[in-house]
Amino acid sequence: MVEQNPAAVIEWVDIVDEQNNVIAQSSRQQMRAQRLRHRATYIVVHDGMGKILVQRRTESKDFHPGKLDATAGGVVQSGENYLESARREAEEELGIAGVPFAEHGQFYFEEECCRVWGALFSCVSHGPFALQPEEIDEVCWMVPEEITARCDEFTPDSLKALSLWLTRNNEQDYGKITPREA
């Protein structure tokens, strides 16, 4: 849910417990500031022939600005289910609408700045893409080998989502894409 008033737009998100049960609502800003556990969607957009659509996040993003993203998606709004969120995010970010989404289950991801229950989806799309300028600077196609070679440039949560998708789709060679240890 997004609440609008003349001073600001407040995006409300559901806060969840360790088992992914909703326990509260919070503003997105408070969720980020306090590192509250929340929900997000991850959508692997692919061409059906081995290439993954990769996005470069804008520098104004509140989470990993300027990094590459192996998935589309975003934070689930309060009261929204995962599929609704995935469809909304794909349309807002990339202009993808009216295509089937495959569901690939849920996963938990945690790092220093984020605790999230993610739902993994995929869809086939060949564009053209209508990029949301506030969110995405550019997109390009990459094969899993390219993503693996450049994994330090990617958001860690999107790498986990992509790794799960590749594993669940029997791409065993690329099933464990993780950022390199510094």
Curated annotation (Swiss-Prot):
Ordered alphabetically, the record's keywords are: Hydrolase, Magnesium, Metal-binding
- EC numbers listed for it are 3.6.-.-
Please report, in chain numbering, the residue ranges of the motif Nudix box. Answer: 73-95
- Cofactors that this protein relies on: Mg(2+)
> What family does the entry list?
Belongs to the Nudix hydrolase family.
State the name under which the record lists this protein: Uncharacterized Nudix hydrolase YPO2781/y1614/YP_2383
The enzyme's first-digit EC class, named in words, is hydrolase
- Give the Gene Ontology MF terms in alphabetical order: hydrolase activity, acting on acid anhydrides, in phosphorus-containing anhydrides; metal ion binding
All copies of domain Nudix hydrolase, residue ranges: 36-164
The record's Gene Ontology cellular component field reads: cytoplasm
Give binding positions for Mg(2+). Answer: E89, E93
InterPro entries (alphabetical): NUDIX_hydrolase-like_dom_sf, NUDIX_hydrolase_dom, NUDIX_hydrolase_YfcD_pred
